[in-house]
């Protein structure tokens, strides 16, 4: 049942968020029942908004772990290089608006309210999932904000994820592990096949960590799509030894993935100086609002927050 504001008055921000949570199935709240296979709703929403994702360049990131760290770091570096950057990630920790940012600033409450109020007569009959609706909101917002480039994080899997309507400059798959096996498959090769669905024709793909069970999956898909492929864990990068703000040994793998991504973007004509990389690497949280990556909340007693899973 859809929530309406009392007396048909304009909804507040909190009422709007409650409406979204109640009306659009959300994976974090109800689990597998929220998952909708297929891109029909996404395409319908995108067409309704005149394909906003075609108005800016895109970097598309999938993987079991490390998507958030890689997404925020690349956004930080590109912002430091002078680009206006959209950032779409999930889930949020505190406020829904964390999911959609431009140059580190969350989408405004007023925009969220306006989007829902103006467009719900169209999307209610579609019964979109929470993530389908959020993705449509992000793409439209980035187009209206005239971002230069957007970092788009996959929600679940890749092949059938609603972000997979994009044609990016660069695709990244951070790693493969067992997660969401009820949707993606029960072997690493099956999961890799789903995530390899983001590999686009003639578009470079970076694999952060490869495994014997998954390497051939990625390699074969890249060959079939005529897409240059880089296995980041097999080749050193000239930026991987730069100082990095995010702590934890596991971040070393992300750094190499990010470094190769930067090199690929530079080769495509993105203007990214070493100074921008150094600043971006050491000011990720300040620049993008990233939280929960081995984040020390207090010293005495030590209290650390990390969202790793």
Please report, for each region that a protein language model flagged, where it lies by residue.
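Short functional linear segments
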Residues: 2-63, 70, 76, 80-81
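Aromatic/hydrophobic pocket-lining residues that form π-stacking "cages" and hydrophobic walls in ligand
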Residues: 74, 138, 218
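Hydrophobic alpha-helical packing residues
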Residues: 74-79, 142, 265
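Nucleotide phosphate-binding/pyrophosphate-handling subdomain across enzymes
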Residues: 149-154, 162-172, 177-180, 190, ...
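Conserved catalytic-core segment of NTP-binding enzymes
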Residues: 158-160, 167-226
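ATP-dependent carboxylate-amine ligase catalytic core
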Residues: 30-39, 44-55, 80-166, 184, ...
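Hydrophobic beta-strand scaffold residues
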Residues: 85, 205, 228-230
């Amino acid at each position: 049942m859809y929530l309406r504001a009392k007396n048909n008055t304009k909804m507040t921000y909190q009422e709007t968020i409650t409406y979204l949570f109640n009306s659009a199935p959300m994976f974090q709240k109800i689990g597998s029942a929220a998952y909708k296979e297929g891109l029909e709703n996404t395409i319908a929403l995108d067409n309704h908004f005149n394909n906003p994702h075609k108005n800016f360049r895109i970097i598309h990131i999938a993987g079991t772990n490390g998507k958030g760290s890689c997404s925020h770091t690349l956004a930080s570096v590109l912002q430091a290089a002078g680009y206006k950057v959209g950032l779409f990630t999930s889930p949020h920790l505190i406020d829904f608006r964390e999911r959609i940012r431009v140059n580190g600033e969350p989408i405004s409450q007023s925009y969220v309210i306006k989007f829902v109020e103006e467009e719900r007569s169209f999307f209610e009959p579609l019964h979109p999932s929470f993530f389908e609706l959020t993705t449509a909101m992000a793409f439209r917002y980035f187009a209206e904000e005239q971002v230069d480039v957007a970092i788009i994080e996959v929600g679940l899997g890749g092949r059938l994820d609603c972000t997979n309507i994009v044609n990016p400059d660069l695709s990244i798959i951070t790693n493969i592990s067992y997660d969401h096996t009820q949707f993606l498959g029960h072997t690493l090769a099956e999961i890799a096949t789903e995530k390899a669905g983001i590999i686009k024709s003639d578009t470079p793909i970076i694999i952060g960590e490869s495994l014997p069970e998954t390497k051939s999956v990625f390699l074969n898909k890249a060959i079939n799509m005529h897409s240059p492929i880089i296995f980041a864990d097999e080749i050193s990068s000239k930026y991987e030894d730069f100082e990095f703000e995010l702590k934890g040994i596991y971040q070393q793998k992300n750094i190499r993935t990010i470094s190769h991504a930067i090199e690929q973007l530079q080769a495509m004509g993105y203007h990214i100086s070493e100074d921008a990389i150094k600043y971006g690497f050491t000011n990720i949280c300040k620049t993008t609002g990233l939280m929960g990556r081995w984040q020390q909340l207090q010293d005495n007693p030590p209290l650390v927050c990390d969202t790793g899973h």
